[in-house]
Every structure is written in structure tokens, then in C-alpha cells.
Amino acid sequence: MTLLLALALAAQGGVATQLSPAPLKLWTIAWQRPLVPPAPLQYQPRELGGPAVDPVSGIVVVGTRDGWIHACDHEGRRAWDFRASGAFDAPPRIFEDVVIAGSSDGHLYALELGTGRLRWKYDAQEEVGTTPAVSGGLVLAMTLQDSLVAVDARTGEWKWRHRREPKEGFTIHGGAAVAVAGGLAIGAYSDGTVAALELQTGTVRWERRVAPQGDFMDVDGLRAEGGRLYAAAYSGAVYALDLQTGAELWALKTPGPCRLALGGGLLVVVTTTQVIGIAPHGGVVRWTMPLEGEPSGDPVAVGARAAVPNTKGLLWIDAATGRLLRVFDPGTGVSASPAFRGRRVYVLSNAGDLFALDVV
């Protein structure tokens, strides 16, 4: 009787009989490696450190919240491990044969890529919660207390420091990594200021406040490309500035912008409520996509897709339309930025498992 009723209803036009389309296949899981042991009674853990991958050897290096840096080869075999005394809250930087990472214990560490042996460490005396940059023989890093430090890339010897007094009261945890372009090192600060400094000396070329007045004025996203600097201020604005002068090129007012990515002729902006695709040269909004879950690490724009870390998982978005294609959900969400090497993508889950995905 039930079957006859279903057939009769299907014959009446207006009743759908087709199943929903199968999810779009974007990747296969090549391997999974647990890196962080489960902690008892830990509620909703978050792994902010994330992976970096060497484009030559394929070695992937991951910093985790329990103070370890782990290195694995392309097949997921453990290569080496290094222990610090504080958490790693941003992906490391691989430069030539060296891994450089900042820790909440206040140190910058330089390790040999092949062995994990400590080459040098620098005591910044403040939490280093951003990915270091390497340029002009210098390692540059922002601390979480609003200092931009520069040290010799070979020895770790101090070269210069630029500091602004942190804004009083609470600020958003984390911050923007140093951007380097055009002979300048650009830092972002919790008082809403962006400062462009001469790379070799730390001399201020220009400073500009980009954050509207508000409770949280942190500048949490920076990207530089093509003579332009893009900045995201949490209190409600995305700016494009002339890299050499700081002059405003365009501004977009939107609540809660906190992370940026550039790629494929698109500026991807992640806010607390949505993801926005913007034309970098004119500031025209091409698309918006509502965001569920909390944003965290920096998005990555690669080719026709953008990958956005989120407490719901790693969101895969069509860069041309803003359509959500798939979500890679390891069960605990993804707070760290992914790392790409060719068709291979490395993702660290909030449970501390490292996944290797092969994009199809």
C-alpha cells in the first residue's frame, strides 16, 4: 500500500523523486597521523600552530599546543621531534634548510630542516604567536605584545625592535604576521595602527591608523602584493593602502574582519560572520558567503578555490562564485591554516591529528 501511494504521488508532477546530488569529491585522504595525546577533561581543544611544507623535500613541519614541533616525510613517517617550553600558536616558516618558529615561551627557534637540531634561539621576552618572515638576511616576527623584532637569520643575533604600547584592556588573541615587500617590514598593532619600517634598520617609513573606534581595534590581517598593502581591522574595516606611502586606495567597512588571503586575482576576507571575495584593485565585493562557526587561522587561496579554517572544519569555497563546495570535518574542527604542496594539502585538526589530503 505504501509503495502504491508513493508511486501515485510521484506521478503527480510537484513531488521530487530524485535523491540529492552526491557531495562533490575534492580530495582523498592519503594518511592521518595523531600528534597530540588526548588531554583529560579538556573541553573543545584548539590547535592554532598548523603545518608548513618544504617545496623541495616534501617534509612537513607542524607546531602544536603542547610545545612540540613534529616533522614528517611525504608518506607520513616521523622524521624528528623538537620540544620547547611553550605552545606554538602559528605555523612555522621553512626557509632553505631551516625551520623558524615562534613560541608562547617567548623564543624564536631556528632548527635544521633535515634533523631538527637547534641552530639558534632568540629570547624575545614576549609571546611569539605569529609566523615569522625571512627577508634580506633577517628573521622578522610580531609578538603578541605589539613588538616587531628582527634578528640575523644565520645567528639569531638581535638587529632591531619596533614596539607600540598595547591597547589597554582586552584584545583579540593572535594577530597578523609581519608582511615584507618593497624593502619594508610591515607590522600590525592592537591599537589599530599599521607601521611600515625600513627592512634593514627598523626606521619608520610611515604609520597609519586603519581601525575605526571600537572595543577591539586589533589589526589582525595583513597582505602585501603589487605595491599595495591590505589590512583587516577587527573593529570594522578592510583597507588597501599604497605600500610606499600608506595613502588610502580604498576602504570597505564591514563588521569583524580578521583574516586575509590573496590569490588568483581575489582578496579573501574572513569576518566573524561571513567570507567575502573582493577585487583587490578596486575594492568591489564580488561575493559573500555566510559563515557558521568561529574563524581562526589564515585562509589560503589556491587556483580556483579558497580554503578557510573554521571550528566547523576546513571550508572549501569556489573562488569565482563564493559557493561552498565541501567541508573537511575531522570531527573537532580546524583552527590552523592548511599548507599546500602541489596537489597535496596538510591539515591539522583541533584534536591534534595531521591529515594529508590529495586534491582530485
Where are the predicted features?
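WD40 beta-propeller blade core
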Residues: H70, Y109, V149, A195, ...
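Sec-dependent signal peptide recognition
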Residues: M1-A6
